[in-house]
């Protein structure tokens, strides 16, 4: 009889992304996901926790209000959707640990937000999101972010305020020239 508590886990994720634009400056995003990490003890959101059946995990519409501002609205989105800041030079989802009790965690629920986005300059975002299928006093998250994005460096300050926890995060990155 083995008393070892070690184990090997293999997880996978299937993802289908559909992007549609009506005006060229907007984006209707639908993402279908499935995977086998539903009961994984790893507790990471990097693999799908949607179960074996293909389901819609993201459904949102992002559009420009004018030259400086954009808005986002949708019935299913992660906390990082619609935030204008750039926390890393690489994969934003991994860098901000979305899906745990961190700065952009709100689960997969409805949300609405507004952002001032600049590819080279100051950014700001305000978003109201939910970790449930509806927005109410128990499930509401207020996610705010300010950031600076330049060609070789940047960062963000992000807050997530709700009834269960308040999270505050600071992220910076430097990407030297001639570095992948």
Question: Model-predicted segments: where are they?
Answer:
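Detector for outer-membrane/organellar transmembrane beta-barrel domains
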Residues: 120-121, 137-139, 144-180
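Disordered, low-complexity tails and leader-like regions
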Residues: 18, 69, 81, 89-90
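A mature extracytoplasmic/lumenal domain signature
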Residues: 32-34, 65, 75-79, 87-88
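Short, flexible helix-coil linker/hinge segments at the edges of structured domains or between repeats
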Residues: 86-97
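Solvent-exposed loop/turn segments connecting transmembrane beta-strands
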Residues: 6-10, 104-108, 131-140, 161-167
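Beta-barrel outer-membrane channel/assembly domains of diderm bacteria
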Residues: 1-71, 98-128, 144-149, 173-177
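Outer-membrane beta-barrel pore domains and translocons
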Residues: 33-35, 76-78, 103, 127-131, ...
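Gram-negative outer-membrane beta-barrel proteins
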Residues: 36-42, 79-83, 132-136, 161-165
């Amino acid at each position: 009889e083995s008393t070892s508590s070690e184990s090997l886990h293999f997880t996978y994720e299937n993802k289908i992304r559909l992007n549609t634009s009506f005006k060229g400056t907007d984006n209707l995003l639908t993402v279908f996901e499935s995977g086998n990490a539903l009961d994984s003890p790893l507790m990471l959101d990097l693999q799908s926790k949607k179960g074996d059946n293909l389901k819609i995990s993201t459904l949102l519409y992002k559009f420009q209000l004018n030259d400086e501002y954009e808005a986002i609205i949708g019935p299913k989105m992660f906390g990082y959707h619609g935030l204008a800041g750039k926390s890393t030079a690489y994969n934003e989802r991994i860098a901000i640990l979305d899906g745990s009790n961190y700065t952009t965690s709100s689960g997969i629920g409805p949300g609405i937000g507004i952002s001032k986005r600049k590819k080279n300059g100051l950014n700001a975002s305000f978003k109201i999101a939910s970790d449930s299928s509806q927005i109410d006093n128990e499930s509401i998250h207020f996610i705010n972010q300010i950031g600076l994005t330049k060609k070789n460096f940047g960062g963000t300050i992000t807050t997530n305020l709700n009834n269960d926890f308040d999270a505050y995060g600071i992220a910076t990155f430097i990407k030297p020239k001639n570095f992948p």
